[in-house]
Regions:
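Extended active-site and interfacial segments that coordinate phosphate-rich ligands
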Residues: 1-2, 18
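Generic enzyme active-site microenvironment
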Residues: 2, 83, 136-137
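Short, polar loop motifs at secondary-structure junctions
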Residues: 3-9
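Generic structural signal for well-ordered, non-membrane alpha-helical segments
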Residues: 20, 24, 28, 40-43, ...
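Short glycine/proline-enriched coil/turn segments at helix->beta-strand junctions
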Residues: 36-37, 77-79, 129
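Flexible, glycine/charged-enriched surface loops at secondary-structure junctions
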Residues: 37-50
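Active-site diphosphate/adenylate-binding microenvironment
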Residues: 48-125
Length: 214
């Protein structure tokens, strides 16, 4: 489904199944009316059954894992607003975060917008001054808008950044592994610390163990 006010933009990059030429506000109003009229009870039951048949697993015999990080986040920030960047950490977040309310998770799904997380988290904090805002990002995505640390300081928007630093563009490398015969290109960021925050005002640390994370 492609909604665009400009007819020339429809199917310009990707051929779409359902083209809708409309102002976004009008189209979204109609979509909301349609969505609210649907009974989702059966669909929710099916999802609950899938969860029972395919429970999430977590290894505990190999040091700190991404899954353990989210386990600790769930215990500590129950009412926080969570924001993800785009990458492997985004997949982990959507699987392992436990959400207690609507509008608690902000993510850019399926759009490949690396660098989205940190600026979006700053905006979420400005709009929710009374809540903690936790941004999950990777070393690749964070570097795309790393300059926004200065914005966060100037706007007095303290955001908690949880940075998964594996020295790779992890999801791109995974695609190269699965679909391109392990021909890796431009995905290794080499081993270095991505901790320039201390020179700009915020505090940064690299915890070696899971209990030290929080």
């Amino acid at each position: 489904v492609h909604i665009d006010v400009d007819t020339a933009s429809i199917s310009r990059n990707v051929v779409v199944d359902v083209p809708v030429v409309s102002d976004a506000n009008l189209a979204l109003e109609k979509l909301l009316e349609w969505a609210e009229s649907k009974d989702t009870e059966q669909w929710q039951k099916e999802i609950a059954e899938w969860d029972k048949k395919n429970p999430l697993e977590m290894r505990r015999d190999c040091g700190m894992t991404p899954q353990m990080v989210f386990e600790h986040v769930n215990r500590t920030f129950r009412e926080a607003v969570y924001v993800t960047d785009v990458g492997q950490h985004q997949m982990w977040a959507t699987q392992y975060l436990e959400l207690d309310s609507w509008h608690q998770l902000i993510t850019s799904g399926g759009l490949g917008t690396m660098g989205f997380g940190f600026p979006a988290a700053i905006g979420a904090k400005i709009g929710n001054r009374d809540k903690e805002v936790v941004c999950f990002t990777g070393d690749g995505g964070f570097q795309m808008n790393i300059q926004e640390m200065a914005t966060a300081v100037v706007q007095e928007a303290p955001v908690i950044i949880c940075l998964f630093n594996n020295y790779y563009l992890g999801m791109v490398r995974q695609m190269q592994q699965l679909f391109y015969g392990k021909r890796y290109e431009a995905t290794c960021l080499r081993r270095r610390r991505i901790c320039p925050a201390n020179c700009k005002g915020p505090n940064a640390s690299c915890p070696p163990h899971t209990p030290d994370f929080i």
